[in-house]
């Protein structure tokens, strides 16, 4: 942490002197060092504090490079908020580790998880069916499928029916559940394995037809993170293969969304106009979110005291339709087309620097207990909880995950699957003849 604070101070001074490239590189180096520190201690590739350190601090370093004309020197309050966001998380995690230690139960024994095979398989069927049926209803009611629409710019933005669309995008959980199923089942039933592969294909087809790059990446990343959480490692060749397969799909969806190179370069306003799009697009999807936070800090007239962060409550209960004023707050961004923001945007919107610090401390506390939990997990669906939080921390530079109703819907759906699998597995653990009969009646 001392090294980080030194690097942070150096980056701040370099930014004030206008030496942007060095300001960014210092923070990127600090992010790598922080990740390596936790990885060497734990051997966990997706250790939650390590992941957050690498991507939050590293993302800030990328933003400090100031490669776009949309970038500007940050205010002192912005620098304080970014420091509080990381310092609160890291400090609370460190405090809890010193008070309680990071041990958390016995190592995983695969034979203990075999009783979860059948409920896991049925969970995949239910979610896949719900997603496909919901997609079909939306397509029928709205009268179009985004992939096949040419004369409707940004068709993906209009392809949703309130409430129902949550079930449509729930398909992103299926690949991760199939990873759990494959590792638990261990190839004992080839027909079910083939069926699981078909369900994976269907669950990936939905975001492709919706031309949603985000949902596609989310589905694949959750599956990869779940595999790493369960196996503790992954071969580099597998990761390279996944990336190679994802690139053409990403390009296809970008074209289908009507985002050609000329359009994107016009929005990004890069200082070097000849910079290739495969560099400028990921750069802007990281860097501009920090710039948007700075816009919020400099332009926000007053705080909203929790209303922004409670948006999932207003959305999932339908209150936003009854009281529109609950969600009628402007978005402060560098450009209207670039609306993605960091994880801490709404925390500052609600309570300023204090909100950012409290929120980061809470995330650090939750992450500590999740890391402890994953070491002694007995229900394999617990790995999906861990993977979701790991992914949200990895993409902490990208959006306000916990102010997003879809995030809570995914967590609730995962909780439902957890309980379903827990109840479905109990018959093999000696919970009595009546419960075994109940299980047989439900699962066959």
Annotate each predicted stretch with a short phrase:
Residues 1, 20-35, 65-73, 113-119, 196-198, 217, 239-240, 357-358, ...:
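Hydrophobic alpha-helical transmembrane segments
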Residues 30-39, 173-186, 358-373:
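Hydrophobic, aromatic-rich transmembrane alpha-helices
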Residues 336-433, 438, 443:
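Hydrophobic alpha-helical segments
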Residues 151-161, 249-366:
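Small-residue-enriched transmembrane helix-hairpin modules in multi-pass membrane proteins
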Residues 1-108, 193-197, 203, 219-259, ...:
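N-terminal "leader" segments that precede or initiate the main folded domain
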Residues 42-47, 180-196, 372-384:
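Membrane-interface helix-loop-helix junctions at transmembrane boundaries of multi-pass membrane enzymes
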Residues 12-21, 97-234, 245-263:
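Membrane-embedded catalytic interface detector for glycan/lipid assembly enzymes
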């Amino acid at each position: 942490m001392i090294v980080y604070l030194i690097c942070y101070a150096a980056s701040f001074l370099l930014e004030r002197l206008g030496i942007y490239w060095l300001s960014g590189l210092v923070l990127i180096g600090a992010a790598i060092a922080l990740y390596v520190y936790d990885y060497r201690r734990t051997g966990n590739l997706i250790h939650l504090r390590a992941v957050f350190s690498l991507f939050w601090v590293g993302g800030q370093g990328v933003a400090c490079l100031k490669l776009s004309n949309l970038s500007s020197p940050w205010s002192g309050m912005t620098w304080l908020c970014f420091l509080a966001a990381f310092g609160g998380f890291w400090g609370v995690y460190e405090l809890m580790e010193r008070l309680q230690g990071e041990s958390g139960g016995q190592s995983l024994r695969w034979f203990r998880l075999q009783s979860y095979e059948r409920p896991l398989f049925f969970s995949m069927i239910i979610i896949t069916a719900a997603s496909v049926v919901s997609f079909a209803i939306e397509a029928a009611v709205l009268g179009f499928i985004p992939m096949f629409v040419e004369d409707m710019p940004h068709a993906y933005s209009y392809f949703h029916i309130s409430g129902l669309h949550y079930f449509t995008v729930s398909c992103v959980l299926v690949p991760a559940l199939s990873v759990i199923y494959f590792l638990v089942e261990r190839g004992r039933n080839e027909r079910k394995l083939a069926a699981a592969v078909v369900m994976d294909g269907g669950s990936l087809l939905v975001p492709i037809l919706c031309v949603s790059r985000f949902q596609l990446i989310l589905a694949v990343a959750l599956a990869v993170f779940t595999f790493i959480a369960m196996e503790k490692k992954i071969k580099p060749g597998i990761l390279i293969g996944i990336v190679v397969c994802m690139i053409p799909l990403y390009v296809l969806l970008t074209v289908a969304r009507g985002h050609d190179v000329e359009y994107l370069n016009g929005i990004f306003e890069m200082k070097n106009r000849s910079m290739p799009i495969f560099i400028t697009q990921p750069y802007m999807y990281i860097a501009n979110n920090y710039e948007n936070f700075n816009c919020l800090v400099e332009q926000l007239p007053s705080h909203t005291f929790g209303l922004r962060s409670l948006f999932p409550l207003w959305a999932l209960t339908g209150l936003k339709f009854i009281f529109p004023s609950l969600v009628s707050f402007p978005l402060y961004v560098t450009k209207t087309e670039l609306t993605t923001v960091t994880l801490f945007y709404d925390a500052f919107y609600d309570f300023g620097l204090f909100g950012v610090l409290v929120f980061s401390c809470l995330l650090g506390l939750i992450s500590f207990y999740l890391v402890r939990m994953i070491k002694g997990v007995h229900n394999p669906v617990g790995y999906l909880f861990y993977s979701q939080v790991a992914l949200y921390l990895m993409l902490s530079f990208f959006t306000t995950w916990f102010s997003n109703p879809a995030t809570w819907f995914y967590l609730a759906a995962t909780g439902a699957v957890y309980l379903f699998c827990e109840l479905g597995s109990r018959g093999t653990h000696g919970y009595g003849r009546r419960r075994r009969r109940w299980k047989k009646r439900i699962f066959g």
